[in-house]
Amino acid sequence: MKQFFITFVLAFIIPATLSAFELENRIPASVWELEMRFQYTPAYNRAFNGYGQEVPLQQLMLWDREWRDSVEGELLRQEQRLEFSMAYGLTEIWMIEATVPLVQRKQTSSLNFTSATSSQQIVLDSLASETQSGPGDISVQIAKDLSVTTRWYNRGGFTFRLPTGNSGTPRGIAPNAIGEGHSSVGAFFHFNWFPLSHGVRNGIRLAASNELVGKRETLEGEEVYYSAGHRADIFYNWSIERQNIFAGTEFHYFQQSESKLPLGKSNATFLKEISFEFGYGNLSELEQKSLSIPWQVRLGYTRPFAGQNTPVANRLELSSTFYF
């Protein structure tokens, strides 16, 4: 049976931009890296408003409507996301990576406005209970190893998001509510520093993306040309890996400018969050010997602690990496 789903007004970027630890490992020429990542966002109903205060989620969705305080009820959302990433070493210093996501989202709404006009009711109907699932947008990364020493490993490159997601009609114009069927181009630099201590790594990743113009549907059901705000991300992580055990933490900050076409006034966004990860695998043994199939499995938890115009949504993640 053919099913039609509506893309929710999501308030966090999907794909790997907000995924857990962005650890860069060298990929020799003609070597494949396969990573499978499962992300689970439990049900949440809170958000940071334009003043950085925690408010009900519907206050964020209806931020530009004066009647939002008259709406009663609750809006709940949750998400499951499965990503497959395949990277290939083109040469000793160049690599290419593609990430294909499968997404399932559920929205539960009991929103009600007793004296709503017909146009206001259309907006509330756009936030009704529903479930949508299907493929997400594919992302491609082309990168080059900039410098490699015993203490430093630096990589830079370009990222491309392709509008391949077809799980529903993109809807909503919050700056970071881009949903599926969206495209962008960006660049990143990742600096890894290895102190003179076995298994310890520090990393800083700087990334920026230019969001391209596409078509969307407003909450009123009108199709418009739309561009999400351009964004910048900063990651800092610290980790230790010894005797096949991995542990680390990462701080992430992102900022996104106001959306464009047709609205965008006062909806700039930022978010601060912290992640913790623990893992097991034989990657640390590569320092002593060659392995037929290097691998690692990690479990992570991410929690936001400050933000503006973005949901308060914790995430759990399970990832596995293999080289062959």
What does each of the following model-derived ranges do?
Residues 34-42, 98-102, 156-162, 204-210, ...:
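Transmembrane beta-barrel strands of outer-membrane/channel proteins
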Residues 21, 42-50, 104-110, 148, ...:
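Gram-negative outer-membrane beta-barrel proteins
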Residues 56-62, 124, 215-324:
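Outer membrane beta-barrel transmembrane domains
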Residues 85-87, 139, 143-145, 188-194, ...:
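Transmembrane beta-barrel domains of outer membrane proteins
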Residues 104-227:
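Outer-membrane pore/translocation modules
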Residues 18-62, 285-291:
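Outer-membrane beta-barrel biogenesis signature
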